[in-house]
Amino acid sequence: MRNFIIAASLLTSAAACNDSPGEIKDPPQLRIDSPARSTIQGKAGLVKVTGVVAPNEVSGEAVEKVLVNNVQATLNADGSFSAMIEVKPGATLITTTARDAAGSYAEDTRAIQAGELRKVGTMIDDALTASMSKTAFAKLSGAASTMIEHLDFMPILAPMQPMAHAGDEAGEDCLFGRMYVDNVSLANADISIVPTNAGLQFRAQIDGLDVPGHARYAVACVNGSNTVRVKAARVVVAGTLVVTPNGPQGFKTSLTGETVTITGLDIQASGIPGAVIDFLSLDKIAGYVISKAAPLAMEPMMNKALGGLAGPQSVDVMGKTLQMEVDPSAIDIDATGALITLNTKMLIKGTETSPGFIFTDNAMPNMEPGNGFALGIADDLVNQMMAEMKETGLMNLAMPATGGTFDNTNIAMSLPPMISADPADGKLKVILGDMIATYTDHGTPVAKAAINAAIELKVVPAANGYGVALELGKPTAKVTVMDDIANATRLTNEDLALATEGCLKGQIETISKLLVNIPLPAIGGLQMRNMKIGSDDGYVMLKGDIE
């Protein structure tokens, strides 16, 4: 049987896999003996490709040369050939081309994956990296101001109640006082977060602060209770905002070296004895509330801005449960901004029996954020997720066809998709290796082909522009019609190859639904602009501006 392959960029995403007969061509006969299709090996390095070529039975044209990934093979008189090619860590597509004297050619493309096999669901060190510039922190400050103005302070203050107390170390006795905050409101907030070599310089200016509450007390063994209200025209709290990793809970924030300045203090405590007011230090309560609540309010914002999840989470992906855990491992702050690294693991429930994913050791990428931000996503994280998706079986598709010589195409994944660097341009692409397409007519197999594709990665806005997500772009496919089943479709190998390409749409949709669940930074009120995608030492790199 003729072995023919066509490489083409898809210009359409037709759902059906149909085509019509074309002109029969007479390429040489080509058989690959090694490596086997869908090979997984433990390390990168040189791989020997062997096979046999012969003239086409009709044309009889002699085979002049054989190329394997553009490396000329040693071609023997009996038609056997061999070539040594370099396989790098990750996924590699091996294309063998045999060309005869008339210019006709036959091709075979197959995939090989090389590297350390690791169990799915394992923690990936430094899976996510993020850097924010000083300019980005200025934008973050504006978002923080808006957030504080609309913040419900009470859940934050609840564990601290009573907010002021004295004389109650042994319980409520003859001389004690306790003051509870009932609500916090304000007219305006101005937050400043500036990275310095000493940490994040934090300043919160609150105008029109109003803190109603109630007090319970006793003086000379006489108990009492009453309402109290503390107001201030302006409260300014400043200090160093300390952001530290807090395991699966994300980041923890606290304020050190704080200073508090209060202007226009008004304490309304009619009926409360002066002694109680004094030892409760109600004149300091306004500053105390802001100095404690404002830094804690920064915690969820920092988690969103820096990529933390504030605890393990589960999301639904095409009916499957994806469990995510992000553990910050380090945060380094200096006058230019901040660099954050996060360890991450993803596990789709029910895929624990997967053979695993190929792990490639990466160095830290260049995280220069410019005047905006930079994000790095390790290929290992995405490859782990795609190995799990393969194990679910959701990528094995049955696609009906009408009006042709076959009525259905069944696609089975023999290898998990992988992100790998394209040897031609160094860009990271998703490699779909050796997807096996079986064409059937009323349930009877009538042809078989192997699909190998490289798909561009794109970065797109998410969450209405307030976040970013990865998306698959335009694929380039190579389809090799296989000899396992005689081609009874009455289509040429070229036609069958073109028909098969349309089936990639389903695979792209499945992978895209998976990629959008990677937890990337998103800050309420700030939009990601001028997004660019690149690669650096095994990381997908996203860079852009914050507005």
Model-derived segments and their meaning:
Residues 84-92:
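Surface-exposed, short loops/turns at beta-strand junctions within beta-sandwich domains
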Residues 13-16:
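C-terminal motif of bacterial Sec signal peptides marking the signal peptidase cleavage site
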Residues 49-57:
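Aromatic/hydrophobic beta-strand junction motif of beta-rich domains
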Residues 19-46:
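Short, compositionally biased P/S/T/A/G/V-rich stretches that sit at domain boundaries
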